[in-house]
Amino acid sequence: MLTLLKIRNLALVDELAWELGSGLISVTGETGAGKSVIVGALKMILGERADKGLIRTGEDTCTIESVFDLKDASEINAILEEGGLEACEDTQIIIRRSIGTTANRQFINDSPVTLTLLKKVGERLVDSCRYSRYTRYICTHQCTHTYKHKTKTSAGAW
């Protein structure tokens, strides 16, 4: 579970430290308030390629840091050990990325890692789904089962 997200010099965000509690978290706000910046930061911390154009105007680097509390670190530890890193001693993992105009660096528990390894770890930390895809699936599923046998023409279309 993500417990802390820190963002510095990313797009319109000068500095943000967001401690997340347990339970459902909803991010809402006006257009341009920074919701997409937060989602983008989370994607980058999980291994997505960084766009240098997102570095805050007038700055050379942006930094994103996250803390995840793990219920079971065995799967993450296996990936870390496979990548030549020490296993997590406790059930917490700290990921940090520094995106610069000349170079990007990423760290897991203060050890430098490749983007490939970061992505492998990131895939195990977060399950993401998009509202639009989920809605499309639900709509398609309901339409298929509700209207499939109503008419001969629609039955052929399914």
Model features per residue range: what roles?
Residues 3-142, 152-158:
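Gly/Lys-enriched N-terminal cap/neck module of very large, oligomeric protein machines
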